[in-house]
């Protein structure tokens, strides 16, 4: 058994359903401390829903920038991940206990096998191998781990980022270990994500008997033209990195349950997934103006889940793409599709954020799994990425002014 597989199995065996870390961070901190990492717990949230957060950084001597004495030449690379997992679903539908890591048919089965405990294990072992070969690197190494990514994402990475920003800790590069591959580890890298903006709309009517519509006001009938217009709106055309912004209804509630009562109100939940061609403020303004134009009596509450972010080609993508090519022979596709991740918080303090992990076909599913070969390939890609960033740092140090 490889060290990566062994650590992955240790993590999967801990039933860390959000926000319970189930001891994962203690295990990882014990692994990082001998490598010279200073481990800080930044736990947050109410006692009954306490979120576990770990910030671990390996100090490195600061070297003045040869071209700008006011800056340092040492860059910081952060691995960001989450130890929490989603609930298992019906246990009887699993082929094996989801928290008893099981190997069969060349795969590792268990909740978190793909999302994302194998990514964490792969990066830890990649660090160990990298530091064994390069005990005094010219890059600073750090990890940001939380047990609140699959849940509200209020007391996890967001809190750590705020604390790092407040004390002036800088991050230059970040790899988020989310499962990004389509078929084989390395075939896709996420170099950005769309923003997410949710709204809850309450449309007020007047309840009444369905046989006397003249004595009532049906909020569903009133809202339908506005909803049709929202659904038909072209918000933007996207760009070379992002598809067009989309607006979707997720829930619609109205009525008393009786078939002879006109409802007094209608409640609608909707969501925008928006590109860098749009902004949250502009989308909010458009929706509110449209509702006013349709003469609705309404209340509208907004929740901004995250702004879009994009990492254009630079040092990190170059290091990652070279690592993937050397390890797998693949030319990674760059994509911004899919849901959101904690990268949306880290992008506030880090200019280069990418996501790289194993295939995502089984995430959140019954019998979640990952190929054993993908686990080792991911570890090697992470290690090669660190080696490439180290080579870049050495080259920059010797470059003439």
UniProtKB/Swiss-Prot annotation:
<comment type="subunit">
    <text>Homodimer.</text>
</comment>
<feature type="binding site">
    <location>
        <position position="115"/>
    </location>
    <ligand>
        <name>Zn(2+) 2</name>
    </ligand>
</feature>
<feature type="binding site">
    <location>
        <position position="82"/>
    </location>
    <ligand>
        <name>Zn(2+) 1</name>
    </ligand>
</feature>
<comment type="pathway">
    <text>Amino-acid biosynthesis; L-lysine biosynthesis via DAP pathway; LL-2,6-diaminopimelate from (S)-tetrahydrodipicolinate (succinylase route): step 3/3.</text>
</comment>
<feature type="active site" description="Proton acceptor">
    <location>
        <position position="149"/>
    </location>
</feature>
<feature type="binding site">
    <location>
        <position position="178"/>
    </location>
    <ligand>
        <name>Zn(2+) 1</name>
    </ligand>
</feature>
<dbReference type="GO" id="GO:0009089">
    <property type="term" value="P:lysine biosynthetic process via diaminopimelate"/>
</dbReference>
<dbReference type="GO" id="GO:0019877">
    <property type="term" value="P:diaminopimelate biosynthetic process"/>
</dbReference>
<dbReference type="InterPro" id="IPR011650">
    <property type="entry name" value="Peptidase_M20_dimer"/>
</dbReference>
<dbReference type="InterPro" id="IPR036264">
    <property type="entry name" value="Bact_exopeptidase_dim_dom"/>
</dbReference>
<protein>
    <recommendedName>
        <fullName>Succinyl-diaminopimelate desuccinylase</fullName>
        <ecNumber>3.5.1.18</ecNumber>
    </recommendedName>
</protein>
<feature type="active site">
    <location>
        <position position="84"/>
    </location>
</feature>
<dbReference type="GO" id="GO:0008777">
    <property type="term" value="F:acetylornithine deacetylase activity"/>
</dbReference>
<dbReference type="GO" id="GO:0050897">
    <property type="term" value="F:cobalt ion binding"/>
</dbReference>
<dbReference type="Pfam" id="PF01546">
    <property type="entry name" value="Peptidase_M20"/>
</dbReference>
<keyword id="KW-0457">Lysine biosynthesis</keyword>
<feature type="binding site">
    <location>
        <position position="150"/>
    </location>
    <ligand>
        <name>Zn(2+) 2</name>
    </ligand>
</feature>
<comment type="similarity">
    <text>Belongs to the peptidase M20A family. DapE subfamily.</text>
</comment>
<keyword id="KW-0479">Metal-binding</keyword>
<dbReference type="InterPro" id="IPR050072">
    <property type="entry name" value="Peptidase_M20A"/>
</dbReference>
<keyword id="KW-0862">Zinc</keyword>
<comment type="function">
    <text>Catalyzes the hydrolysis of N-succinyl-L,L-diaminopimelic acid (SDAP), forming succinate and LL-2,6-diaminopimelate (DAP), an intermediate involved in the bacterial biosynthesis of lysine and meso-diaminopimelic acid, an essential component of bacterial cell walls.</text>
</comment>
<feature type="binding site">
    <location>
        <position position="364"/>
    </location>
    <ligand>
        <name>Zn(2+) 2</name>
    </ligand>
</feature>
<keyword id="KW-0170">Cobalt</keyword>
<dbReference type="Pfam" id="PF07687">
    <property type="entry name" value="M20_dimer"/>
</dbReference>
<feature type="binding site">
    <location>
        <position position="115"/>
    </location>
    <ligand>
        <name>Zn(2+) 1</name>
    </ligand>
</feature>
<dbReference type="GO" id="GO:0009014">
    <property type="term" value="F:succinyl-diaminopimelate desuccinylase activity"/>
</dbReference>
<keyword id="KW-0028">Amino-acid biosynthesis</keyword>
<keyword id="KW-0378">Hydrolase</keyword>
<keyword id="KW-0220">Diaminopimelate biosynthesis</keyword>
<dbReference type="InterPro" id="IPR005941">
    <property type="entry name" value="DapE_proteobac"/>
</dbReference>
<dbReference type="InterPro" id="IPR002933">
    <property type="entry name" value="Peptidase_M20"/>
</dbReference>
<dbReference type="GO" id="GO:0006526">
    <property type="term" value="P:L-arginine biosynthetic process"/>
</dbReference>
<dbReference type="GO" id="GO:0008270">
    <property type="term" value="F:zinc ion binding"/>
</dbReference>
């Amino acid at each position: 058994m490889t060290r990566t597989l062994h650590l992955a199995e240790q993590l999967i065996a801990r039933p860390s359903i959000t926000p319970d870390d189930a001891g994962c961070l203690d295990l990882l901190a014990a692994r990082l401390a001998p490598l010279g990492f200073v481990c800080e717990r930044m736990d947050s949230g109410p006692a009954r829903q306490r979120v576990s957060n770990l910030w671990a950084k390996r100090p490195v001597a600061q070297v003045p920038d040869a071209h700008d004495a006011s800056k340092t030449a040492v860059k910081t690379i952060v691995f960001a991940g989450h130890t929490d997992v989603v609930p298992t679903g019906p246990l009887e539908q699993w082929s094996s206990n989801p928290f008893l890591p099981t190997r069969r048919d060349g795969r590792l089965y268990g909740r978190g096998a793909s999302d994302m405990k194998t990514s964490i294990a792969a990066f830890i072992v990649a660090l160990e191998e990298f530091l064994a070969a390069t005990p005094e690197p010219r890059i600073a190494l750090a990890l940001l781990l939380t047990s609140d990514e699959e849940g509200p994402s209020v007391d996890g990475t967001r809190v750590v980022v705020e604390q790092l920003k407040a004390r002036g800790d800088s991050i230059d590069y970040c790899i988020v270990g989310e499962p990004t591959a389509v078929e084989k580890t390395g075939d896709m890298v996420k170099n950005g994500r769309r923003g997410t903006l949710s709204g809850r709309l309450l449309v007020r009517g007047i309840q009444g008997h369905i046989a006397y519509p003249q004595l009532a006001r049906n909020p569903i009938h009133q809202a339908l033209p506005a909803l049709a217009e929202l659904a038909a709106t072209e918000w933007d055309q996207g760009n070379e990195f992002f598809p067009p912004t989309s607006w979707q209804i997720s829930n619609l509630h109205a009525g008393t349950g009786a078939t002879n009562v006109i409802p007094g109100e209608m409640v609608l939940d909707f969501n925008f997934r928006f590109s860098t061609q749009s902004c949250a403020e502009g989308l909010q303004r458009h929706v509110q103006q449209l509702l006013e134009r349709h003469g609705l009596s309404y209340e509208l509450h907004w929740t901004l889940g995250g702004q879009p972010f994009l990492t254009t080609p630079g040092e990190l993508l170059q290091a990652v793409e070279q690592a993937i090519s050397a390890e797998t022979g693949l030319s990674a596709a760059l994509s911004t599709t899919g849901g959101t991740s904690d990268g949306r918080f880290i992008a506030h303090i880090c200019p280069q954020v990418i996501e790289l992990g194993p295939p995502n076909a089984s995430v959140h599913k019954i019998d979640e799994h990952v190929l054993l070969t993908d686990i080792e390939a991911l570890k090697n890609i992470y290690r090669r990425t660190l080696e490439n960033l180290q080579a870049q740092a050495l080259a920059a140090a010797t470059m003439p002014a």
